[in-house]
Amino acid sequence: MQIIHHGAVNGVTGSCHQLDINPQLPSSYLIDCGLFQGAETAGKNSASQLQIDFPIDNIKGLIVTHCHIDHVGRIPYLLAAGFNQPIYATTATAALLPLVIEDALKVGVTRDQKLIQACLNQLSKLIVAIDYHQWIA
């Protein structure tokens, strides 16, 4: 087992970690996929902070810990990169996630309702709500 950090390494925002359960098999899970914020983005190309610059073909799912933007804000970019696997979250987080993503897209990306709705439609197909004390397999 290994953990690969794709964010929140030199600071606290941009949480995005890959749990590789068995490096011999395509069995990774992504834990969060958040935006970098504040001082951690100063002097850096903002587009490079949004890109998904790691391979996603062996990732079996995304586990969202909670609905703060520094934990979920890059999900639209993950979807745009071709991610099409389950997005696991608690029932409460699963209910909030589309609202948070919609707001983030309107504030930081576009007000084009067609683009926003396309992203939300794709997102809603992938969300899997998990009750507390329920295991995922």
Predicted regions, residues:
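A short acidic, often aromatic-flanked loop/helix-cap motif at beta-alpha or helix-coil junctions
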Residues: G11, H133-A137
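Extreme N-terminal starter segment of soluble prokaryotic enzymes
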Residues: M1-I4, S28
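Pre-active-site segment of Zn-dependent metallo-hydrolases
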Residues: V9-G14, I21-A81, Q85, A89, ...
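Short acidic-hydrophobic, aromatic-tinged amphipathic segments that line or gate anion-handling sites
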Residues: K125-Y132
